């Protein structure tokens, strides 16, 4: 009968061990209280041998299942440590007089460790009552080690191997401590023994072995982010950091062997895939990208749903998603992480390292007034009002992911009562667009956020106008939140009910939106003042160029040409009167030295003969009844006697003039242009 009772207890413990739930572990660890023995020692040697053998079998089973989660890994470590203690302290019996105090301390630590387990309150109270009814003198250290270490006369605890698995490293100080004041020293002693044990941790090969070893000792501080490693061959998660439990609630090893994209929201999977496909060619071009270059984007990740207790049943929790900022880094798989019989050429087996950081709402209280130093975010939209770019900094302020806004009309996010203000704002945008790089700040206006509320924005507007077509290309708004929304959590689902607006107001709002889009599609005109300034500047440049061109002609070249015109003058010779048309030329207006050429022809009739001479050539013949002619060049004089007449005409230039000869100064090109 004794053997049957012990066998039934061990069977219940093994079933609880396979179930893995905290409730079964706790119930299995104290099942000895109802076995009929009340925790009293057994005097049969066969029972002792069976206990030792069963505990060793449990240790081997735990070593085989080392990848079952963080709690299982700690249990494996504790079992390995207890095995090492078994060989070291085989002959040392432990005192067993402080079991009640140790049980109370361990109960408190177990309540803290398993405070979030889904066990029912009645089961917990029943467990505590069973622990108080135990009259044992059993040692807590014997339960931690899980083996019998004394002879037949020594007290043995009732076999409960599950008590080893539920004790985390932080609770190790319960074993061997007689009062609560010595708890810290017991913890230090257990840590020291655990580290010195030969079966402390099995070496982990593959990605993330170092990070896996750091999270096993002591109390772990909650982290705000987690990292995971994904194989680019099939998209399977190879490793996750322990902080995934704090961030998303998943057990540490629950993601292993599953596709990462299964945990991404459906609407964000296309964005995730595009980031991967664009990042792979960049990562393959070695040397062109820095080693730590990352691409960041935002997605929604699924949170661990789990189950919650509701009376005697469980109720499924709704699936929820949380926004995260993902940083992607492509790495080549390490050589030692590959199997020995499978070698891959360099560059073909790549790993994707993802660092996920949760995005929190920027607001803490409803209708929060933010300071002037609050961060800004930019939203760019085209001339048709379609959003083309959103900063990732807008996620915490508006609740939208960038891919949620891109492709939508920005007019849908303005409050219907502020559309008239926005129409004036865009009129100013078109006027400022006449000057490149001009910006201005508009009046505050309300903007719709993800949870259905509105925030008050202050915006600095800039625009870009195509210099050739004079068309508006896009408008950029640098926004800053002036007043927060009524609901602080911007990531909550928007209410299904919509704001009721009259048909007249809806038609008016639609008309204003159409007017804004038409205004943005118009050609940006240049101001008249700018045109006048450009024409005046061009005239001045042309006149300056022509003056420079005329200055290149030297005054000496102009002197060789013809000068101003002088007045005609008369002069008288000794015996003849010559009528001469005189032309006087000069540059500076003063008479110069000239050379005159004259030709004279004379005809005389008389009874005598006459001879005319002059400078140059001239001949004259005369008979009494004949005629005489004479020609001459230059300044000539002629005399004749007889009854003949001789006349001479000539033209030439003289060195001086009696007429009024006036010099005309040169006229510049600018003056001539202005005179014309």
From Swiss-Prot:
One of its GO terms (cellular component) is nucleus. Residues 589-645 are annotated as: 28 X 2 AA approximate tandem repeats of G-T. Residues 108-120 have a biased composition (Basic and acidic residues). One of its GO terms (biological process) is entrainment of circadian clock by photoperiod. Changing residue 57 to N: In strain: MA-3. Residues 53-66 have a biased composition (Basic residues). GO terms for molecular function: transcription cis-regulatory region binding; transcription corepressor binding. InterPro entries: PAS (IPR000014), PAS-like_dom_sf (IPR035965), PAS_fold (IPR013767), Period_circadian_regulator (IPR050760). The keyword Disulfide bond does not apply. The sequence shown here is that of clones MA-1, MA-2, MA-4 and MA-5. This is Period circadian protein. It comes from Drosophila mauritiana (Fruit fly). The lineage of its organism: Eukaryota, Metazoa, Ecdysozoa, Arthropoda, Hexapoda.
């Amino acid at each position: 009968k004794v053997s049957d009772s012990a066998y039934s207890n061990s069977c219940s413990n093994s079933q609880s061990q396979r179930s893995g739930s905290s409730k079964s572990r706790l119930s299995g660890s104290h099942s000895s209280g109802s076995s009929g023995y009340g925790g009293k020692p057994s005097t049969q040697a066969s029972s002792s041998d069976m206990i030792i053998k069963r505990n060793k079998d449990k240790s081997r089973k735990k070593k085989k299942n080392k990848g079952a989660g963080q709690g299982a890994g700690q249990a494996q470590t504790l079992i390995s440590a207890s095995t090492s203690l078994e060989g070291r302290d085989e002959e040392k019996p432990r005192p067993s007089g402080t079991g009640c105090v140790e049980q109370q301390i361990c109960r408190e630590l177990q309540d803290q460790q398993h405070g979030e387990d889904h066990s029912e309150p009645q089961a917990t109270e029943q467990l505590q009552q069973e622990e108080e009814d135990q009259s044992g003198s059993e040692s807590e250290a014997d339960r931690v080690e899980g083996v019998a270490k004394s002879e037949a006369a020594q007290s043995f605890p009732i076999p409960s191997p599950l008590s080893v698995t539920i004790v985390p490293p932080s609770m190790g100080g319960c074993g061997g401590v007689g009062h609560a004041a010595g708890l810290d020293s017991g913890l230090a002693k257990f840590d020291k023994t655990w580290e010195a044990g030969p079966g402390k941790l099995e070496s982990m090969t593959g990605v993330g072995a170092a990070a896996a070893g750091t999270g096993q000792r002591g109390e772990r501080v909650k982290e705000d982010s987690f990292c995971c490693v994904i194989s680019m061959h099939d998209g399977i998660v190879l490793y996750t950091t322990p902080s995934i439990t704090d961030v998303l609630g998943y057990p540490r090893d629950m993601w292993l062997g599953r596709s990462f994209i299964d945990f991404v929201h459906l609407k964000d999977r296309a964005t995730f895939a595009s980031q991967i496909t664009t990042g792979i060619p960049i990562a393959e071009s070695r040397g062109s990208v820095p080693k730590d270059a990352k691409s960041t984007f935002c997605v929604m990740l699924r949170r661990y749903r789990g189950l919650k207790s509701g009376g005697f049943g469980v109720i499924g929790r709704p699936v929820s998603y949380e926004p995260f900022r993902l940083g992607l880094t492509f790495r080549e798989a390490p050589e030692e992480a590959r199997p020995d019989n499978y070698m891959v050429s360099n560059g073909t087996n790549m790993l994707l390292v993802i660092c996920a950081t949760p995005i929190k709402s920027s607001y803490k209280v409803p209708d929060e007034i933010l300071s002037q130093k609050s961060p800004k975010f930019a939203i760019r939209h085209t001339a048709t009002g379609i959003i083309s770019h959103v900063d990732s900094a807008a996620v915490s302020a508006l609740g939208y992911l960038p891919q949620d806004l891109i492709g939508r009309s920005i007019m849908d996010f303005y409050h219907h009562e502020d559309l008239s203000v926005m129409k004036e704002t865009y009129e100013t945008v078109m006027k400022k667009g006449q000057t490149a790089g001009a910006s201005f700040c508009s009046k505050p206006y309300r903007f719709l956020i993800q949870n259905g509320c509105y925030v008050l924005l202050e915006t600095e507007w800039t625009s870009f106008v195509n210099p050739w077509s004079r068309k508006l290309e896009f408008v950029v708004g640098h926004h800053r939140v002036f007043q927060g929304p009524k609901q602080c959590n911007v990531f909550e689902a928007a209410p299904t009910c919509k704001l009721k607006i009259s048909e007249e107001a809806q038609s008016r709002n639609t008309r204003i939106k159409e007017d804004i889009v038409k205004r943005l599609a118009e050609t940006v005109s240049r101001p008249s003042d700018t045109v006048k300034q450009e024409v005046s500047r061009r005239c001045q440049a042309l006149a300056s160029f022509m003056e420079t061109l005329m200055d290149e002609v030297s005054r000496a070249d102009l002197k060789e040409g013809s000068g101003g015109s002088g007045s005609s003058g008369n002069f008288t010779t000794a015996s003849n009167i010559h009528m001469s048309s005189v032309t006087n030329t000069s540059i500076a207006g003063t008479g110069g030295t000239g050379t005159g050429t004259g030709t004279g022809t004379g005809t005389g009739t008389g009874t005598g003969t006459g001879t005319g001479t002059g400078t140059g050539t001239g001949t004259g013949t005369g008979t009494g009844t004949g005629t005489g002619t004479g020609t001459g060049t230059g300044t000539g004089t002629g005399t004749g006697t007889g009854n003949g007449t001789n006349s001479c005409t000539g033209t030439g230039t003289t060195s001086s003039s009696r007429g009024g000869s006036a010099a005309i100064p040169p006229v510049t090109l600018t003056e001539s242009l202005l005179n014309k």
